[in-house]
């Protein structure tokens, strides 16, 4: 699973990445093995993913959140949903 956090490294984007990593851990998954959490900072790459407002979260190519910091619980829910596909 690939979880991308799109943003320019601002505090909101950092909080989003932290929540994504925490969600992976709480689900008993290993960061870097079961799920790769990557930060996308390049404006062109962010735009290519259809993101207009950061932070945004994309899981396996599907944008699940944009323009706000999702809670760890929300990210866990999205991960579980994506695992079923």
Where are these regions (language model features)?
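Signature of N-terminal electron-transfer/Fe-S-associated modules in redox systems
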Residues: 24-26, 54-55, 70, 81-82
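Thiol-based oxidoreductase modules, predominantly thioredoxin-like and allied folds used
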Residues: 32-43
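Local sequence-structure signature of Cys/Sec-based thiol-disulfide redox active-site neighborhoods
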Residues: 1-22, 26
């Amino acid at each position: 699973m690939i979880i991308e956090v799109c943003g320019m490294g601002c505090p909101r984007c950092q909080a989003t990445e932290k929540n994504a990593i925490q969600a992976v851990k709480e689900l008993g998954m290993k960061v870097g093995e079961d799920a790769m959490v990557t930060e996308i900072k390049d404006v062109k790459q962010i735009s290519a993913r259809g993101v207009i407002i950061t932070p945004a979260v994309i899981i396996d190519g599907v944008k699940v959140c944009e323009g706000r910091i999702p809670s760890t619980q929300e990210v866990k829910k999205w991960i579980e949903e994506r695992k079923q596909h």
